[in-house]
A protein has these predicted regions:
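Structured alpha-helical
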Residues: 1-107
Length: 107
């Protein structure tokens, strides 16, 4: 990943493997994959067929038998490797609580 992309991050990402389903809002197309890292503001998803950059998505994460769905957008892709997702900034307190619990559990 480039230094420029790293500089744009507001929250540190931590290694976290979770099942994920990415749903394209415009088409309903679904992609099942897994995350390799997670933060309060986004995640990286390992997939051979990343969704195009700028696509608006819903991200359904499952970790520790708990499910969380967040709105977001694909911010970059690495063909054959994966894609970076930025979550919408307006997380509900419940969504933020789940993310924080998962992130703290990885330390």
């Amino acid at each position: 990943m480039s230094d420029a992309m790293q500089d744009k991050r507001h929250d540190p990402r931590v290694p976290l493997i979770a099942a994920v389903e990415v749903i394209e809002v415009a088409t309903g197309t679904r992609l099942s994959a897994r995350t390799s890292d997670l933060s309060r503001s986004g995640c990286y998803i390992d997939t051979l067929n990343p969704t195009p950059s700028k696509t608006v998505v819903r991200v359904r994460l499952t970790h520790l038998s708990e499910e969380l769905e967040l709105p977001g957008r694909v911010v970059y892709t690495s063909p054959g490797l994966g894609m970076g997702i930025r979550f919408d900034e307006n997380l509900t307190p419940a969504q933020a609580s789940v993310l924080d619990r998962w992130l703290l559990g990885t330390k």
